[in-house]
Amino acid sequence: LEGDPMRGISRKPKLDDEPARLYDYQFDVDNRGKESILVDLQSEKGIGLIHLLCRSAQIFMCNLLPNRQQKFQLDTKALLAINPKLVHATLTGYGSDGPEAWRPGYDVTAFFGRSGLYDAMKEGSAGVVPNARPAQGDHTTGLAFSAAILAALRLAEQSGQGQTVETSLFETAVWTDVFLLFRRAVFYSPVRQRAREELLSPM
């Protein structure tokens, strides 16, 4: 078992007063203040450990595709049977149903690429696609995910019944660009922006 692959992207700091050790800044930034355990989901013991933790948990967050959740008994039905008040939250690339539900998704593919954001950010007909900032789509989708979880947690506390929420990189990206997409659908206006020198305000 190796755990999260992001742990392995390390480098030495350039600050003189820092100790001579490797920093995995991407993992540290996103996981500061958290405690981690490594679980083998290929074993019954590992799945049993997750089920044991879920008995007293309020929230279960998962980024596995729906078919893999079922394979490892981590789907909504399996976990709500263990803890009927649990909030089961799923974040995927393209959602849990529809023709793309089986497809893995990443920040640059599902959020920026398939949503059309890359193309929409080009300037003019011959514009260059800008580089996406690292994890910008991941972090934006994480905010939507946390808002859904908090709302579901509140409802679970009030009703005494477990809740299921989900979001995806693709759906969140579409929402961030909804004004341009709406304009395209209703007025047939181009989604792509004009070049900066053609605008009254280059900002």
Regions found by a protein language model. Name each.
Residues 1-28:
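Glycine-rich phosphate/diphosphate-binding loop of Rossmann-like nucleotide-binding domains
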Residues 8, 52, 148-152:
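Alpha-helical scaffold segments in soluble metabolic enzymes
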Residues 14-18, 97, 109, 113-203:
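Acidic, glycine-rich segments within the central catalytic cores of soluble metabolic enzymes
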Residues 19-81:
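A structured beta-alpha segment of the ubiquitous adenosine-cofactor-binding alpha/beta core
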Residues 36-38, 88, 164-166:
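Conserved beta-strand scaffold positions in the cores of enzyme catalytic domains, especially
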